């Protein structure tokens, strides 16, 4: 069992999943993970499926050099976005794994929220490409480690409503004006 960078507040109401050394681009996966952070589990799964079908885009905020603009990014209050299909598929598989862990623990999957998701760089894999004049250049891949913690959302209890709202304190000047209005109307 690997270590997680963070432990959840309530261990009995949360579940974890991780994927080490995934052969998927780190930068794309980081942006996709930031998009689903703090989403309910069902919404995150719908979002990732929509990204695969190019119905919704992933906003690129940090690693956005050379990323084109798209109209779908407006809903995220940004201009740049892409549809990283492979990253979305890997994260969707990880969320399915975490959901299965939640079912095993007896938690309600419909009330789960993506509490923590983190993407770290893994060790680069080295290949080579052949260039002109007998030279060789590196052809590196940038895999990543991903970890997810889902937490069951607590029921929010609303405050009791008072019958009379607290009266606003009025200044002497305003009280004087109100008295004058009352006298004029009579």
Swiss-Prot record:
Keyword Protein biosynthesis among record annotations: no
Q: Which UniProt keywords apply?
A: Ribonucleoprotein, Ribosomal protein
Q: Tell me one Pfam family matched here.
A: Ribosomal_L22
Give the Gene Ontology MF terms in alphabetical order: structural constituent of ribosome
Q: Name one GO cellular component term.
A: cytosolic large ribosomal subunit
Return the PROSITE patterns for the record: RIBOSOMAL_L22 (PS00464)
Q: Where is the composition biased (Basic and acidic residues)?
A: 177-186
The segment annotated Disordered runs over 161-186
Give the residue range of the signal peptide. none
GO biological process terms, alphabetically, are: cytoplasmic translation
User: Its family?
Assistant: Belongs to the universal ribosomal protein uL22 family.
User: NCBIfam families annotated for this entry?
Assistant: PRK04223.1, uL22_arch_euk
Q: What is this protein called?
A: Large ribosomal subunit protein uL22
Q: Name the species this protein comes from.
A: Drosophila pseudoobscura pseudoobscura
């Amino acid at each position: 069992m690997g270590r997680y960078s963070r432990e959840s507040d309530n261990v009995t109401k949360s579940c974890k999943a991780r994927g080490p050394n995934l052969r998927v681009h780190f930068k794309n996966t980081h942006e996709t993970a930031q998009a689903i952070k703090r989403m309910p589990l069902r919404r995150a799964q719908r979002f990732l499926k929509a990204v695969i079908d190019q119905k919704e885009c992933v906003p690129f905020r940090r690693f956005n050099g050379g990323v084109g603009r798209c109209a779908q990014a407006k809903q995220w209050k940004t201009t740049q976005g892409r549809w990283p299909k492979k990253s979305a598929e890997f994260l969707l598989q990880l969320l399915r794994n975490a959901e299965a862990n939640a079912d095993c623990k007896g938690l309600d999957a419909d009330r789960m929220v993506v509490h923590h998701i983190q993407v770290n760089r893994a060790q680069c894999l080295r290949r080579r490409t052949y260039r002109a004049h007998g030279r060789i250049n590196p052809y590196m891949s940038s895999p990543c480690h991903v970890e997810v913690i889902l937490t069951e959302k607590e029921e929010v209890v609303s405050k009791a409503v008072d019958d009379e709202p607290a009266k606003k304190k009025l200044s002497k000047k305003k009280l004087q004006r109100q008295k004058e209005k009352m006298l004029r109307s009579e």
